[in-house]
Design a protein with these regions (language model features):
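Short loop/turn and low-complexity linker motifs enriched in small/turn-promoting residues
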Residues: 2-22, 28-67, 74, 85, ...
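Extracellular Ig-like/FN3 beta-sandwich strand-entry sites
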Residues: 77-79
Length: 213
């Protein structure tokens, strides 16, 4: 009997050690992801998509950006001040949400950007794809309230949760769980890049999934 109890205790101890190790691994993964997310969220992209060089001040520091260029800087959360062409604008960078794919742009020229819901799905009709990806408020051709897969942005400071930033290409394929049949990835475009991406006659893009699980 004692031998049986000892074996049971040893087995329980081994299980606890294994469970503890698994929990520790999970915690390390979560913490690592959080640190990576916070590190990326601390960065902001100053972007100049125009044909002219621009000069401005951010929090009292002078910057010059050549045409069609950008610069990545560290920008802390809180209030900041931008001075451009005699106009002073104050904006606030929010703290990122837990494990959020936070992305921010400083847009001195107030140029147009587009946040687009790219849908990847299996056996989806164009109507289904449009309904599932249209999560942003917009207006239809008659000016009535509607839902669209894109959101237009032109603020001095843009902060959004995205999967792909300005210079990151969307993949041709992504993994899609069988239980959902589709997934949506958010991509942020410069206005001109979005027009080229969509094409003159296209309204939406439906991409094929890979390794449907």
């Amino acid at each position: 009997m004692n031998e049986f109890l000892n074996e049971a205790k040893a087995g329980a101890k081994a299980w606890l050690v294994k469970a503890g190790t698994s929990l520790a691994v999970i915690l390390l993964v979560v913490i690592g992801a959080r640190v990576y997310s916070s590190s990326k969220s601390a960065e902001s992209v100053i972007d100049n998509p125009t044909e002219e060089a621009i000069t401005f001040k951010l929090d009292g520091k002078d910057y010059t950006l050549e045409p069609k260029t950008s610069q990545v800087i560290k920008l802390s959360k809180g209030e900041h001040t931008l001075e451009y062409l005699g106009e002073t604008t104050k904006f606030t960078k929010k703290a990122p949400k837990f494990l959020d794919t936070d992305y921010s742009i400083i847009n001195p020229t107030k140029s147009l950007y587009v946040l687009y819901n790219e849908i990847y799905g299996e056996n989806l009709t164009e109507t289904e794809a449009d309904e599932k990806s249209s999560t942003y408020d917009c207006e239809d051709d008659q000016g009535k309230p509607d839902k669209c897969p894109r959101k237009f942005l032109s603020d001095v400071f843009i902060q959004e949760s995205v999967d792909y930033g300005l210079d990151e290409a969307t993949p041709d394929n992504v993994d899609v769980a069988k239980s959902t049949r589709y997934t949506i990835k958010k991509k942020l475009f410069r206005g001109d890049d979005f027009s080229k991406y969509m094409g003159a006659d296209s309204e939406d893009v439906i991409l094929e999934p890979v390794e449907v699980k």
